[in-house]
């Protein structure tokens, strides 16, 4: 039985709680139809990575195996249910989004039901989150792309209105820009 997702979730959550942060966990609901093509593309990439992992395994190439192993991971419904149970046992709130979790979290921050969305993804800003916190890592490190190396990171608070003002655009223009670059 795989438990690494729970160990990681527990240690990250405990670290946040020790710092006085009470996270609210927002889980994705049904993905929008518009994302179906993207989901299929991601599935194909995972299958390709699995094939390359097996090829590297046959050659006993540990570096290539490690490189492709991380690209093959999947979250099952059981893993998500276990994560929800752990979060609940920690006494933290769980929100089940009707669709995309990023949109739900952004809405909650807009309505002052939370300080900021915690995510590496900028989508919550496109959905109107007033604040986004990135790089919430315990170790202060993050994997460098698809390499084996790591880079040092620090938490980053991004204020939507400040950035819109600096760019000289409004929220609707940010949405159009996001659509043009494909986020």
Residue spans for each PLM region:
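Non-catalytic, usually N-terminal nucleic-acid engagement modules in DNA/RNA processing proteins
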Residues: 1-46
């Amino acid at each position: 039985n795989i438990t690494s997702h729970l160990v990681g979730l527990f240690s990250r959550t405990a670290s946040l709680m020790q710092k006085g942060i009470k996270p609210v966990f927002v889980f994705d609901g049904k993905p929008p139809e518009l994302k179906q093509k993207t989901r299929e593309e991601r599935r194909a990439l995972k299958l390709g990575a699995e094939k390359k992992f097996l090829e590297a395994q046959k050659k006993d190439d540990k570096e290539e195996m490690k490189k492709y192993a991380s690209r093959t991971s999947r979250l099952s419904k059981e893993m998500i249910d276990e994560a929800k149970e752990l979060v609940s046992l920690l006494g933290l709130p769980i929100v089940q989004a009707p669709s995309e979790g990023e949109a739900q979290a952004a809405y909650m921050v807009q309505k002052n039901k939370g300080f900021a969305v915690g995510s590496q993804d900028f989508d919550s800003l496109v959905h109107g989150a007033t604040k986004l916190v990135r790089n919430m890592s315990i170790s202060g490190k993050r994997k460098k792309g698809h390499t084996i190396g790591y880079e040092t990171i620090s938490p980053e608070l991004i204020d939507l209105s400040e950035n819109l003002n600096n760019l000289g655009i409004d929220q609707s223009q940010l949405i159009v820009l996001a659509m043009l670059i494909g986020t």
